[in-house]
Amino acid sequence: MATQNVDSGHEDMVHDAQFDYYGKFLATCSSDKMIKIFDVGGENPQHLVDLRGHEGPVWQVAWAHPKFGKILASASYDRKVIVWKEVGNNSWSIIHQYAGHELSVNSISWAPHEFGLSLACASSDGSVTIHNYNNNVWEAPQKIQVSQIGVNSVSWSPAAIPTSLVNSANTIIPAPIKRIVTGSCDNLIKIFKNVEDKWILDKQLEDHKDWVRDVAWAPNIGLPYSKIASCSQDRSVIVWTQDENGVWSGKPLPKFDDIVWRVSWSVIGNILAVSCGDNQVTLWKEGVDSEWKLISHVENN
């Protein structure tokens, strides 16, 4: 695949860039308070529109599944979460806005589309809010108190049930349970599950020695386990695996040379991308011996 360079046109640091579901559109956000959308489906990227609505640096953007239309969420230092929707050709409107967090909103994550249009938002105030759209109305958000200090990242579990690929044809597969994982400034990873429309703490994972900067739940194609990647200010990445008995165990990757800011899984969950503060991105894959091995290395200039 040929590499494309996109001149974002932002006037300050770019904090996030996300492709839509089909890889045709790219959204970027910046400390200049702006969100920009580009058409990258052709040979030359084309800037389409600027979205203005935030009053501070915009940390993250996230595309919803296309079954709901062309919808983009954004999170900002201004304590606001905004959900945008394209209502005409390059014409976007705000369809939901929430300013109830007391401090910066650091991370946002859309639920798998099987769970409906649902957005999780993690904040420096120590909470995560869940925003659900039902019956043409945005419901009052559900609030989860995660930590006494800030939450840096949130990620949804996939809707696929572990072991569904290997179960026999006569096995009754239970409905998936809504779960999220968070990473916070108390060095902890916490997993919450939704039981009778209430979010309860399911598991706490404790191996990091400094702030957890990012968490990412791996896609699941029906194999008999779940995986979560976490990264930290302590320069470590840990891949957590939940076995068939529900027990979580962590496997650390080799120590990195700088703070690890982001982790991201490939579409089928077999390759992990790791982004560090020294501008290096590395790709890792689990071997047959269950050890994670470096398969590619990219240094950004």
UniProtKB/Swiss-Prot annotation:
It is a peripheral membrane protein. PROSITE patterns: WD_REPEATS_2, WD_REPEATS_REGION. WD repeats lie at residues 9-48, 53-94, 100-141, 146-202, 207-250, 255-294. The keyword Methyltransferase does not apply. The lineage of its organism: Eukaryota, Amoebozoa, Evosea, Eumycetozoa, Dictyostelia. Keywords: Cytoplasmic vesicle, Endoplasmic reticulum, ER-Golgi transport, Lysosome, Membrane, mRNA transport, Nuclear pore complex, Nucleus, Protein transport, Repeat, Translocation, Transport, WD repeat. It is found in: Cytoplasmic vesicle, COPII-coated vesicle membrane; Endoplasmic reticulum membrane; Nucleus, Nuclear pore complex; Lysosome membrane. GO terms for molecular function: structural molecule activity. Gene3D superfamilies: YVTN repeat-like/Quinoprotein amine dehydrogenase. The keyword Glycoprotein does not apply. Present with 21400 molecules/cell in log phase SD medium. Component of the COPII coat composed of at least 5 proteins: the sec23/24 complex, the sec13/31 complex, and the protein sar1A or sar1B. Component of the nuclear pore complex (NPC) which constitutes the exclusive means of nucleocytoplasmic transport. Probably part of the GATOR complex. Pfam families: WD40. Belongs to the WD repeat SEC13 family. This is Protein SEC13 homolog. GO terms for biological process: COPII-coated vesicle budding; endoplasmic reticulum to Golgi vesicle-mediated transport; mRNA transport; positive regulation of TOR signaling; protein exit from endoplasmic reticulum; protein import into nucleus.
